[in-house]
A protein has these predicted regions:
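Short, low-complexity N-terminal intrinsically disordered segments enriched in polar/charged residues
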Residues: 1-35, 39-40, 44-48
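Short beta-strand edge/turn micro-motifs at domain boundaries
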Residues: 2, 95-101, 115-161
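Intrinsic-disorder-associated interaction segments
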Residues: 6, 10, 14, 54, ...
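A broad structural signal for short, well-ordered beta-strand segments within beta-sheet-rich domains
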Residues: 12, 16-17, 76, 85, ...
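A solvent-exposed, acidic/Ser-Thr-rich amphipathic alpha-helical stretch
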Residues: 34-35, 39-98
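Short beta-strand segments enriched in hydrophobic/aromatic residues
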Residues: 41-42, 104-110, 148-151
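Soluble ligand-binding/transfer domains with enclosed cavities or grooves
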Residues: 68, 72-95, 104-116, 121, ...
Length: 161
């Protein structure tokens, strides 16, 4: 049994953040509906930095996922995705800052197809990320306020992104 703070009280706990990371990547792998993943990022004040864009709202994040606003949609570009969390580093308990800085390393493998190629192409990377998590003002649950892909390190044999 976990010893967690009540939802909405203080900064997110290690257990909450680890559970969040697992759920986050499961949802990305399954290409869940935007309504099921967009609430996991802060709406006002979001900074979501990926190699191809910086997103600043839930609306922009949703467009980045499924297409719109000049984004092709990562759900449209990649398939058979598998994210494997390698590590989640959280500051020690007792930190009283409202934003918790988290270091995440995730292995990401997927396939993509560039028409008119006869076959799809495997890609694989270790993604080194920094997250800042806060509690949602609406739900009290942890959400991503800042998400930065610090490095995408290609696996042996992977073409560049």
């Amino acid at each position: 049994m976990r010893n967690e703070r009540a939802e909405g009280a203080g900064p997110a706990t290690r257990d909450e953040i680890e559970d969040f990371a697992a759920d986050w990547y499961r949802k990305l792998d399954e290409h869940v509906a935007t309504a099921d993943i967009v609430p996991l990022v802060l709406d006002q004040g979001l900074e979501f930095v990926v190699p191809e864009a910086t997103l600043r709202s839930r609306n922009e994040f949703g467009q980045w996922l499924v297409g719109g606003g000049g984004h092709p949609g990562v759900y449209n570009l990649f398939f058979d995705e598998v994210h494997t969390v390698r590590s989640v580093e959280v500051p020690p308990a007792g930190t009283s800052v409202p934003r918790v800085q988290v270091k995440v390393v995730v292995n990401w493998q997927a396939r993509r197809w560039h028409p008119p190629a006869p076959r799809s192409q495997w890609i694989g990377f270790d993604a080194f990320q920094t997250w800042e998590m806060v509690r949602s003002p609406d739900t009290g649950k942890p959400v991503i306020a800042r998400y930065v892909v610090d490095e995408l390190r290609p696996m042996p044999g992977s073409p560049p992104l």
